[in-house]
A protein has these predicted regions:
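Ferredoxin-type iron-sulfur electron-transfer modules and their immediate structural context
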Residues: 1-131, 135, 196-210, 225-227, ...
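Iron-sulfur cluster-binding cysteine motifs and their immediate structural context
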Residues: 68-70, 108, 122-152, 156-173
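C-terminal, active-site-flanking charged/polar segments
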Residues: 236, 242-253, 258-271
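Short secondary-structure boundary/capping segments
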Residues: 74-76, 184, 215-217, 266-270
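Hydrophobic/aromatic ligand-binding patch that stacks against planar heteroaromatic rings
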Residues: 49-51, 160, 242
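Alpha-helix N-cap/helix-initiation motif
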Residues: 121, 150, 232-233, 260
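Flanking helices and flexible, charged tails adjoining ferredoxin-like Fe-S electron-transfer domains
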Residues: 1, 91, 113, 153-239, ...
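Short, solvent-exposed coil/turn elements at secondary-structure transition points
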Residues: 13-15, 143, 172, 232
Length: 271
């Protein structure tokens, strides 16, 4: 039996791509398709510009600049160095598992009436537009809109929003502030002669680091109180100042490898 051919073979230059897992749209220049009909050697079709197609997953082996900003946060897009065979094998395996039905977490909530992006066609605040690493936020007249399919949930937009128009659903600011106050109240009840407490903010990656420090070393000092949040970038100047107002002597942020250091740096400077 002849093997089945349930895929197309094309050649061209991938110019751009939009979308996310399950809904990518790609634009290809110098597009040629292999014609499997006829006798003898297969021939390529006539080249054309601006060819468009849809796909569920993109495995990018071109090298050079990725198609998306913060490409590691774009679901369904796998960019690897084609010269490194183990990385290619790992990416192929990962792509092969992207089958089935997936749920996308809605990380943030917006309240357009509070948005200070623009009024009467006069541009104002663009904090979230400037800081979003994935390009999920776009201008929509007087307001901004967030594409939930592209949003990676870093939380930087909520931390930088001056009006409260964007709130981070996993760790709302009000919840984080209550947790900080509860830590402070608990410490005061048992502190005795211990020095002023210090707050250590971390995520799941930091939790593992703290656990290893306790297992293989001395762990945290007695007056260092850890608090875990979903996304480090969602911890902004308001939360930091709230911690200081509660009685903490200082606030330390334990960065993870994927943390947005630019957004965090802006909030630290503001605080």
């Amino acid at each position: 039996d002849m093997p089945s051919r349930n895929y197309d073979i094309i050649a061209g230059n991938l110019r751009r791509a939009t979308g996310t897992l399950g809904n990518f749209e790609v634009t290809i220049d110098a597009l040629q398709q292999l014609d499997p009909t006829g006798h003898g050697t297969h021939e390529w079709s006539i080249s054309r510009q601006g060819g468009q197609s849809h796909c569920d997953i993109i495995l990018d082996l071109r090298g050079g600049t990725p198609l998306f900003p913060a490409h590691e946060k774009r679901d369904g897009y796998l960019w690897v160095d084609a010269s490194h065979a183990p990385s290619v094998a790992k990416a192929i395996l990962k792509a092969s598992h992207m089958v089935g039905t997936f749920e996308k977490t809605l990380f943030v909530k917006t309240e357009p009436s509070l948005c200070a992006h623009s009024r009467a066609q006069k541009s104002a605040c663009s904090n979230c537009l400037d800081i979003c690493p994935t390009g999920a936020i776009t201008s929509a007249g007087d307001f901004v809109q967030i594409d939930p399919a592209i949003c990676a949930g870093c939380g930087a937009c909520a931390a930088l929003c001056p009006s409260g128009s964007i709130t981070y659903e996993a760790d709302p600011s009000s919840t984080t502030l209550r947790r900080i106050q509860a830590l402070m109240d608990g410490y005061n009840k048992v502190a005795g002669d211990h020095p002023q407490p210090r707050l250590l903010v971390h995520d799941a990656h930091g939790r593992d680091m703290i656990a290893m420090a306790a297992r293989f070393g001395d762990g945290l000092v007695a007056n260092m109180l850890p608090i875990e949040i979903e996304a480090i970038s969602s911890f902004g100047h308001a939360e930091a100042l709230g911690a200081l107002a509660s009685g903490f002597g200082d606030v330390h942020i334990l960065l993870s490898p994927t943390a947005d250091q630019v957004a965090i740096g802006r909030e630290v400077a503001l605080a």
